[in-house]
Design a protein with these regions (language model features):
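Conserved class I S-adenosyl-L-methionine
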Residues: 1-53, 85-88, 95-98, 104
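Conserved Class I S-adenosyl-L-methionine
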Residues: 3, 62-64, 204-286
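Class I SAM-dependent methyltransferase SAM/SAH-binding core
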Residues: 54-56, 62-119
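A short acidic, Gly/Pro-enriched loop at the edge of an enzyme's catalytic core
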Residues: 116-129
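Residues lining the SAM
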Residues: 131-135, 165
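A short, conserved alpha-helix within the catalytic core of class I
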Residues: 137-151
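Helix-to-beta-strand junctions that scaffold the AdoMet/dcAdoMet cofactor pocket
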Residues: 139-140, 156-158
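Conserved catalytic/acceptor-binding region of the Class I
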Residues: 147, 153, 159-225
Length: 286
């Protein structure tokens, strides 16, 4: 159960944190990615995603949102910089057919790299771009999303919808109290990628800088629920939001701090439950 939730950014001095990227990708796919399913469903319903949709998913991760769009009949392309997550996306969207079986549905494309690498001169322009990896928790995430949009929007037709997602107000997101651990542990590095509270106009500012026309917005309840504290720690670390703290200390120390911060959200049966609200913005390509 999502951006992100903001993922695979480099830590201070450009060096990656000391983590097992394969294990982290599996934790993202198996634990954390589904947390944003209500967001995906709401957007797909509102925009009537279906057989006429040609979708480009930015930071598509292990492909759950793409799979949900594909089951509605959309032609989907996903792009991401994480080979570990994309390997899982390919397993979901491009499974090996059984011998003699006929392929069902429309083919998906999974692209490693940047949006520019998803260009296909032989295919029609995209009419929907999604950036479901939520911004609003890192000092540098809006700028990074802007860079992706600068490459992606030329691949879309005029009037195409562009969906941006972000964390809601800290007071509406119980997970914010846990994410403050990231800021405290990363503080010695003064890292540009460390956590910060979401701001009200984060999404609007990104859309305006990208030259998009704002066309609507909404809020969606996306509670984070975990079977136990260990699953919660693994899921949250898989987002990448704690990478600066891991670089400043180590993964074990960060895990202990996160587990302690989760105690107020632990229920009598051992499960962890944190209500959150996420925002989405719909903009249009001019």
């Amino acid at each position: 159960m999502t951006p992100t939730l903001v993922r695979h950014h480099l830590s201070h001095a450009g060096s990656p944190p000391r983590v097992n990227l394969g294990a982290r990708a599996r934790d993202w796919s198996e634990i954390q990615e589904r947390m944003l399913v209500p967001l995906y469903e709401t957007v797909h319903e509102r925009l009537e995603v279906g057989p006429a949709t040609r979708l480009l998913g930015l930071r598509c991760g292990s492909g759950l949102a793409l799979l949900m769009a594909a089951t509605r009949g959309a032609a989907v392309t996903g792009v991401d910089s994480s080979p570990e997550r994309l390997a899982l996306a390919r397993e979901r969207l491009l499974p090996d057919p059984a011998p003699g079986a006929r392929a069902r549905g429309r083919a998906a494309r999974i692209v490693e790299g940047t949006p520019r690498d998803a260009a296909d001169a032989q295919a029609p322009a995209y009419n929907l771009i999604t950036a479901f990896d939520p911004i609003g928790c890192r000092a540098d995430d809006a700028g990074r999303l802007g860079d992706l949009l600068a490459e992606a929007t030329p691949l879309a037709e005029v009037g195409a919808a562009v969906v941006l997602a972000g964390w809601g107000p800290p007071e509406r997101c119980a997970t914010s109290s846990v994410l403050r651990v990231a800021a405290r542990l990363a503080d010695p590095l003064r890292s540009a990628g460390s956590w910060r509270p979401a701001r009200r106009d984060d999404l609007e500012e990104v859309a305006q800088r990208a030259g998009l026309r704002i066309d609507g917005s909404g809020r969606v309840s996306c509670p984070f629920g975990y079977a136990d504290v260990d699953s919660a720690v693994r899921g949250l670390l898989s987002t990448g939001l704690f990478d600066a703290g891991i670089s400043a200390t180590d993964e074990e120390q960060v895990g202990k701090e996160v587990a302690e911060a989760l105690h107020p959200h632990r229920r009598a049966d051992g499960t962890v439950w944190m209500p959150n609200v996420f925002r989405y913005l719909i903009a249009r390509v001019r």
